[in-house]
Amino acid sequence: MRLKRHFKFLAFTASVAVVVILSAFSFTAMWEDPPIIPGSGVTEIKMLSEWLPSIEGTMLDTEVYIIRGAEEGGRFLLLGGTHPNEPGGTLAAVVFVENVSALSGTVYVIPRSNHSAFTHNDAMEGAPQFFSIELPDGSERVFRFGSRRTNPIAQWPDPTIYLHPTGATLGGGEVSNLNRTFPGRENGYSTEKVAAAIMNLVLEEDIDLVCDLHESSPEYPVNNAIVFHQEAAELAIMTQMMLEIEGIDIRLEESPVNLRGLTHREIGDNSDAYVVLLEVSNPSQGRLRGKTTEELVTEGIDKYYLQASKDGKLFAPYDESGYPLDLRVARHVATIRVLLDSWNMMFPERTIFLSDVPPYEGLVDGLGTYLNPVS
């Protein structure tokens, strides 16, 4: 009898060990970055740690892709992956890295701004770790679906109350949210260090224009919108008007003065750069969604959001076709293109002329067409 119990205990222990080992492999697989394949327009790749050496060799460090034109001009910083559970922002930045060239000016692209947050998922959300996009040759590109917050391995524990550098108080969990920690602290929490590194880049490289790419829940009021620092109001208005001429509806939201830590507020207040943040609707991160699957991430089809739309509960259009990733990336890329067109009209002495920006219709028809195959 005692031997039988001993055998059961050993069998149970072995089963637990197998589960733990398999879970560990799954967890650590998130630490490996899916490749980004730079196009011919990328002239240099640096690491963010160049602007804050203390993050070198940590999971906070991330690539900065530089697209430099033959002619001098303005300097543009494009941020993707501030929130890695908002893949439309990440993929729009990747599309720029893999396709775009500069004729004048310089573009700095950070597709995985909060790199650490790509290495895990939000707890208890049941989200997929990865999603894939098919390319015209039948191959697939794999990307990570991450978290809104910095990995606890890189930053733990969070305080009960987060005292922001401006003196404002926020919920303690916001210290893990990159878009609440700007302008950052070089010797602060890990997330603050990332914000400080990006802020140093803006200041040291004399960045003229910053665009931070996001997605928002369909039921969230700030949706399909340009959020702008007050200094960038005229630029945002011109961009909206030009987009509407192209048939792309987009809202304008001015950055709240008292809401601290956001890119558009803090970079705008602490530098000479014009700063905007773009939002596009994403059903896979909303609270009304059903099961969070890879298909929901890429296709954006959800029966609960369809019902919510019929009930008039959403702030973005939604029908049986869903809100696919192709469309979300297309909206971001088109808005950036028109934003730069508007910039060039307003500041002809600091132009940022780009070539090979994928067209809106082409991206809507298939994002995979504009992603480079992995050799």
Whereabouts are the PLM-identified features?
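C-terminal accessory segments enriched in acidic
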Residues: 2-66, 190-209, 213, 218-375
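Proline/glycine-enriched tight loop/beta-turn segments at coil->beta junctions
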Residues: 68-75
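Glycine-rich His-Gly loop
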Residues: 69, 80-84
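Di-metal (Zn2+ and/or Mg2+/Mn2+) metal-binding site signature of metallo-dependent hydrolases
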Residues: 83-91
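A short, Lys/Arg-enriched amphipathic alpha-helix followed by its capping loop at the start of a domain
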Residues: 92-105
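Short glycine-rich or small-residue beta-strand-to-loop segments that form or flank ligand, phosphate
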Residues: 75-81, 110, 181
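Short, solvent-exposed loop/turn elements at domain surfaces
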Residues: 74, 87, 285-288
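Active-site/substrate-binding loop(s) of hydrolase catalytic cores
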Residues: 87-88, 103-241
